[in-house]
Amino acid sequence: MDKELDVSDLEPPEPLERILDAIMELRPGQRLAVSHRRLPYPLFDMLRRMGHRYETTGEEGRYRILIWPSGE
């Protein structure tokens, strides 16, 4: 089951901090589904370095970012 996190109403750097905290709490096989009002480009670089993959969907102001470990 995916873990849901909505950071769309938060101001920087809180969205990044909450997303990183939630990633650390993921259980094996679990993915993180994030609702965000913008594309967090600094996060994408961090995810690659951490060994995670991501997929984005949506449009300006309403994005959904799905995050999971590379090996899954």
Residues covered by each model-derived region:
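Sterically constrained small-residue positions within well-ordered secondary structures
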Residues: 25, 45, 56-58
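An N-terminal amphipathic alpha-helical segment
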Residues: 1-26
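C-terminal edge-of-domain segments
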Residues: 55-72
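Short, structured protein-protein interaction patches enriched in aromatics and acidic/basic residues
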Residues: 33-53
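Intrinsically disordered, low-complexity terminal tails/loops enriched in metal-binding residues
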Residues: 2-3, 49-50, 71
